[in-house]
Amino acid sequence: MRKILKLKVGREDLILETGLLAKQANGAVLATYGGSTVLATVCCSDSARENLDFVPLSVEYNEKYYAAGKIPGGFIKREGKPKDKEVLVSRLIDRPMRPLFDKRFGREIQVVPTTLSTDQMNPPDIVGMNAAFAAVFLSDIPFNGPIAAVRIAYLNSEFIVNPSFDEIQDSILDIVVAGSLDGITMVEGGANEVSEEVLLAAIDQAYEYIKQICNLQKEFILIVGEREKLPLAYEERVFEFKAELKDFIYSELKDACFVKGKLNRDKAIKLVKQKAYEHFSSVSQVDEENETLFYKALDDFEQEIVRRSILENNLRTDGRNPTQIRDIVAEVDLLRRTHGSALFTRGETQALAVTTLGTSIDEQIMDDIDGDKRLNFMLHYNFPPFSVGETGRLMTGRREIGHGHLAQRSLEAMLPKKDDFPYTIRVVSEILESNGSSSMATVCSGSMSLMAAGVPVKEQVAGIAMGLVSEGDKYVILSDILGEEDHLGDMDFKVAGTKNGITGFQMDIKISNVTKQLMKDALAQARIGRMHILSIMDSVISRSRDDISVNAPKIIQLQIDIDKISLVIGSTGKTVKAITDEFEVRVQIEQDGRITLFGTDSLKMQKAKARIESIVREPKIGEIYEGVVKKINSFGAFIELTPTKEGFLSNRPKSRDDRYGDMRHSRYGSGRHSRYGRDSRNTFAMRPPRLEEGQMVKVRISDIDKFGKIELELVRD
């Protein structure tokens, strides 16, 4: 039966509906906010796998073009593989939801939020998040919900709940917060150098609405009726010889956990575990049935050792204290032919960033249901398997897209406006080594490579990943976490920014009791770390170079009247093509009359600019041109001053000082002129130049009549 509930969230009602659509799914909710509607469904497989150490969850957010009344562009007129935006929204939904599923359920779970309608004002991603969370909570799949999500913008010193696209564009803060009734579980967003206090206040504002939406879902359960949950595939089991295993292995495992160097440490831990396996197999205490439980017990011991060392001794596996940052080495200009390059190495994490400058033709065109967009800044993050000493396929996965997006948002606010720097900018980050925080290393190397390329960025940007180990009311915040600290810890909080404020952030929390004070402490510690990293980066390069790379394309801009655009283009593009071919430049003409020239030869570009200026310039009496003789007749010659203007050079004298004969005949003149250069009026005829079609001559505008016809006279050198 159809059930509907609504709640005022910001300026619109959030409407949740179930019982009408997709009734064969385990759970289905239709969510509407303003004119944006998303249907979210959740299904699970019939069979389960035992002893999984992960949740087999997949989230497939997708947007239908018909939602905006559009047909897909290109040759294929149906939706294809997921766009980057759909991947990013899928990750937004996945991350806060995944820790709330019980691993013992064992079945594959698929959540599919589908945008069915959009008003192109209210972003459908937040609608899709709440639809997905509600669908799972109402389903028969075991889930420790409810959870909800809210977006906050900060505009004119005021917080806006679930802002419109325009408000997000104008805001200095765009933050998405997800959480449960117990606390915040995820934060992600970008900003324009906001303070830690503003960020915390935005999270507080979001959490008030999150609690209301969670209570709305609980009310929904009361109306619809709580469904009996599907059974767990297995009960939590532990290795029955865990005590003996601990006595046998704990001391050696503890020593292995503190071996210096990631690869050496991993190898040492692996050898200790292998030794334990061989011993317990020999006494028939490990077999196929309990092998998974055996290795899980070893992992539990490792986690216990690492966490206890941090909580009790403030000692991390690589020997650092909680606030200490790994050694940093940075340099620029490694690659000679690129437009800008930088290498940032922090401990065993290394990112090589390369900046390339292109023209407006290189912009990425986005065919999107929210409206077509042109992106003139892109950051692509690559994580090859060799960065962690492994083999594998070289491909771009969801993780790469997500990490690249976070780094891009962190740098974007510091870039110049397109009108001030009309280049297309592409930054590629190659992760060459990885042991935690590679996305923040990308921010650091990307910022330096932009400066090295001569992009006038406002400020240097650095990033740091923060971690957390907690037990009860006690917690220790970690600066610059390792990969294992991310895996074994309770939080991954990435913060990027300048010396003035925060520009990008992403937080995932595995525990439910994260307090405001804890987040405040984490942000304060992150700021100290960020300042330290910025000081090292500034010692290498502290400001953008005055000039762009000699290898980058040059740009010249000029403005013409709108009604002169057709003159520059010419009939069927003839004029602009001639300029392009002759001067080896690209010409970009905007509808507002702004013309941009792209090329590599500065001299040719200046000549192309002069040609365009001459085309659109209004002729004035007395101006001198170097024109081409286009046609000669008995009265004179037609001279092409510009591709769009011609003047007439007459051979008939206007006074006694005008002494030119018929230009088509001999250099001594003809007709009434005598052989000796004197005519019947006793005027002197100089030897005029012989003019031929195609010849270049220097002329001066002597007169312009009321019809715009131009009369010329020769200019003698």
From Swiss-Prot:
Coiled coil: none annotated. Residues 553-612 form the KH domain. It comes from the Bacteria. Pfam families: KH_1, PNPase, RNase_PH, RNase_PH_C, S1. Its cofactor is Mg(2+). The keyword tRNA processing does not apply. Its main location: cytoplasm. Residues 650-683 are annotated as: Disordered. Its EC number is 2.7.7.8. Keywords: Cytoplasm, Magnesium, Metal-binding, Nucleotidyltransferase, RNA-binding, Transferase. GO terms for biological process: mRNA catabolic process; RNA processing. One of its GO terms (molecular function) is RNA binding. GO terms for cellular component: cytosol. Residues 654-665 have a biased composition (Basic and acidic residues). Residues 622-715 form the S1 motif domain. Residues 666-675 have a biased composition (Basic residues). The keyword Protein biosynthesis does not apply. Mg(2+) binds at D486, D492. It catalyses: RNA(n+1) + phosphate = RNA(n) + a ribonucleoside 5'-diphosphate. It is found in: Cytoplasm. Belongs to the polyribonucleotide nucleotidyltransferase family. NCBIfam families: polynuc_phos, PRK11824.1. Involved in mRNA degradation. Catalyzes the phosphorolysis of single-stranded polyribonucleotides processively in the 3'- to 5'-direction. This is Polyribonucleotide nucleotidyltransferase. It comes from Borrelia turicatae (strain 91E135).
